[in-house]
Structure formats: C-alpha cells, structure tokens
Amino acid sequence: MLEVLQESLRKAPIVIRGEYPYFIHPISDGIPSLEPELLDEIADHMIDIAGKDYDRIVSIEAMGIPLATVLSMKTGKPMSIVRKRQYGLEGEVILSQSTGYSKGELYINGISKGETVLVVDDVISTGGTLKALLPALENMGANICNVIVVISRGDGAAKMSDMGYNVNTLVKIDVDMDGVSILEVAGEQQ
C-alpha cells in the first residue's frame, strides 16, 4: 500500500534548518521532481478515504496545489486554494498561522456558507496551519467533511484531535540525520 510514496520517502535527502532535520520530498517541496505516479497513487488513496460526497476541495499554497489539482481532476469537484497573499476580494478571510518553522497570514477566498469541503494538505508537523484554517472555515459556515494530509511528522495530528478534528494521514514518519523512518502507513504501524 502506497509503495511509491514509501519508496520516495526512504530516498528523501535530509538537510538541517536551524537544529531541525528537514526532509526534502516532492510532495512537501516539489523537488527533486513530482512524478505523476506518485500524485496518482496519493490521489487514489485520498479518494478511497474521502469518497466524493463534498462540494469543494480546499488546500493551502504552495504544495497543497498539486494535490488539490489532481483530486479535482479525478473527482470533478472544484478547488479553492488558501493563499499566502491578500487579494482584497469581498468576503476574503484573513487568518494568522504559525508552523514549526514560519509564521504568516493566510487568505481564504471562494468558499460559500453551507458548502461541504474536503481539506487536503501535504504535511502536518506542529498542526499550526490546520489549527488556524479549520476553525476559520467553520466560522465562514463551511462544513468540513474530512481532513487528509499526506505526511504526518510530529504531534500535529494529535493536537488537532485534541481540538476535535480528525486528521487522516497517509503516512506517519520520523526524521533524523540518518533519513526518514516510516512509522505508519494508512494508520497501520510498520
């Protein structure tokens, strides 16, 4: 299960950001190359989890864009991208987010009250992005049917659970200077 994803994670190079070992991967960074087989495998698994009973796919710039795009094409559902810059459109919602290595504002456009949304993202580490995004979507009147993240690292998914949000993850990993260790695949320990 998710063999292409697992193999690509095992081959991921590790760099140090401050004191933080950081893995470089096509899903989280877009480099070295985001292959169609990897996107296809991930999208099919996300569809298996979420089905198609929602109105819109919501994801976060930048690396949520390829995930949302392939899901949109496979399901025929429209997508909205939460951006990192302001457009000043009517109804735009601004939220502050803080991740394990950055802080900033996010801008939500194109989501209507009463819509049922599927939220997808590339990685959850601290949970900072989803901690800001999910309540904001609910405050806008959106119904969140599911949250799916490709890669879980750290305790972010557990923190979201403590807030009442179930985050489905495709793989849970640990990263050190020796590389990426795969701890769980689709909820099953390895």
Swiss-Prot record:
One record GO biological process: purine ribonucleoside salvage
Pathway in which this enzyme or protein is active: Purine metabolism; IMP biosynthesis via salvage pathway; IMP from hypoxanthine: step 1/1
Record-linked Pfam families: Pribosyltran (PF00156)
Native source organism of the sequence: Methanococcoides burtonii (strain DSM 6242 / NBRC 107633 / OCM 468 / ACE-M)
Subunit: Homodimer.
Catalytic activity: IMP + diphosphate = hypoxanthine + 5-phospho-alpha-D-ribose 1-diphosphate; GMP + diphosphate = guanine + 5-phospho-alpha-D-ribose 1-diphosphate
EC number: 2.4.2.8
Protein task: Catalyzes a salvage reaction resulting in the formation of IMP that is energically less costly than de novo synthesis.
Subcellular location: Cytoplasm
NCBIfam families listed in its UniProt record: HPT_Archaea, PRK02304.1-4
GO molecular function: guanine phosphoribosyltransferase activity; hypoxanthine phosphoribosyltransferase activity
Matches recorded under InterPro entries: HGPRTase-like (IPR026597), PRibTrfase_dom (IPR000836), PRTase-like (IPR029057), Pur/Pyrimidine_PRTase (IPR050118)
Swiss-Prot/TrEMBL keywords: Cytoplasm, Glycosyltransferase, Purine salvage, Transferase
Protein family per UniProt: Belongs to the purine/pyrimidine phosphoribosyltransferase family. Archaeal HPRT subfamily.
PROSITE patterns named in the record: PUR_PYR_PR_TRANSFER
Coiled coil start-end: none
Gene Ontology cellular-component annotations: cytoplasm
Name of the protein this chain belongs to: Hypoxanthine/guanine phosphoribosyltransferase
UniProt xrefs under HAMAP family: Hypx_phosphoribosyltr
